[in-house]
């Protein structure tokens, strides 16, 4: 049950999940993720799927408080400047290390092109890596809800994205299909091993995850979207 609380309840838990204590969990919800590109669509099912694979600088817990995720700490050096300490020892599911430059790349990607999440962080005027694995974010004025906004911005591997032609977010509204709209590779607790749009998505445990694997006993999650509920 710890897994359900940590990974689903804080994020619009509208699905039906069973059995709770099995190594394989079958998960149903009304509708499917529209895309696997974590910046291409800002809507519930897409975020639900992305959160199993991708992570943010900060996250929300069951009581909706902000907690560290890929950033271990943060501070404001002035009302318009935030400095985030990036967590050491984190690797993407392909084994490559998370770097401050991946965070910079991801935030800039989320701010540009056809990204559907740019409105969430449009107060950001610049983002850069500094020293000691830190990232500095500047805003166009004091922004007391920046942490809440950043909790919805997922961090991608810069190298993986560029290798696969995904430097820019998928243009979902133009029906564009990219490698990153049908594949995913993040730092989260699961990896996607099968993707059948609107039919079935299979997630398997990411053994390289930096978090506490004892928080859940799941080896696999099978998402079976209930498309008929959309029309009720």
Model-derived features: where do they sit?
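Surface-exposed binding/hinge segments that line
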Residues: 75, 119-169, 196
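Sec/Tat signal peptide C-region and signal peptidase I cleavage site
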Residues: 16-22
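Gly/Pro-rich hinge or "lid" segments in bacterial periplasmic/extracellular proteins
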Residues: 65, 153-216
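Aromatic- and charge-enriched surface segment that lines or borders ligand/interaction sites
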Residues: 72-116, 130, 136-138, 146
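Short, well-ordered beta-strand elements
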Residues: 23-31, 72, 81-85, 103-107, ...
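Conserved small/polar residues in nucleotide/adenosyl-binding loops
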Residues: 230-232
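Bacterial N-terminal signal peptides that target proteins for export
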Residues: 1-9
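N-terminal lobe/hinge region of extracytoplasmic solute-binding protein
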Residues: 28-77, 108, 183-187
């Amino acid at each position: 049950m710890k897994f359900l609380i940590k990974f689903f309840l804080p994020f619009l838990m509208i699905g039906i999940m069973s059995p709770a204590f099995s190594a394989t969990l079958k998960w149903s919800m009304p509708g499917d993720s529209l895309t696997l590109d974590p910046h291409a669509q800002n809507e519930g099912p897409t975020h639900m799927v992305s959160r199993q694979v991708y992570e943010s600088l900060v996250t929300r817990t069951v009581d909706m408080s902000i907690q560290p995720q890929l950033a271990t700490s943060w501070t404001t050096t002035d009302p318009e400047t935030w400095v985030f300490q990036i967590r050491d020892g984190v690797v993407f599911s392909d084994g490559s290390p998370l770097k401050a430059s991946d965070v910079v790349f991801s935030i800039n990607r989320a701010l540009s092109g056809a990204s559907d999440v740019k409105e969430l962080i449009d107060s950001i005027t610049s983002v850069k890596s500094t020293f000691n694995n830190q990232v500095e974010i500047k805003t166009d004025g004091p922004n007391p809800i920046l942490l809440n906004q950043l909790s919805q911005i997922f961090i991608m591997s810069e190298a993986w994205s560029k290798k696969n032609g995904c430097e820019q977010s998928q243009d979902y509204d133009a029906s564009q299909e990219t490698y990153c709209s049908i594949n995913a590779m993040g730092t989260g607790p699961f990896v996607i091993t099968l993707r059948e749009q609107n039919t079935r998505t299979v997630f398997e445990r990411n053994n390289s995850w930096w978090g506490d694997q004892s928080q859940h006993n799941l080896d696999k999650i099978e998402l079976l979207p209930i498309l008929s509920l959309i029309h009720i």
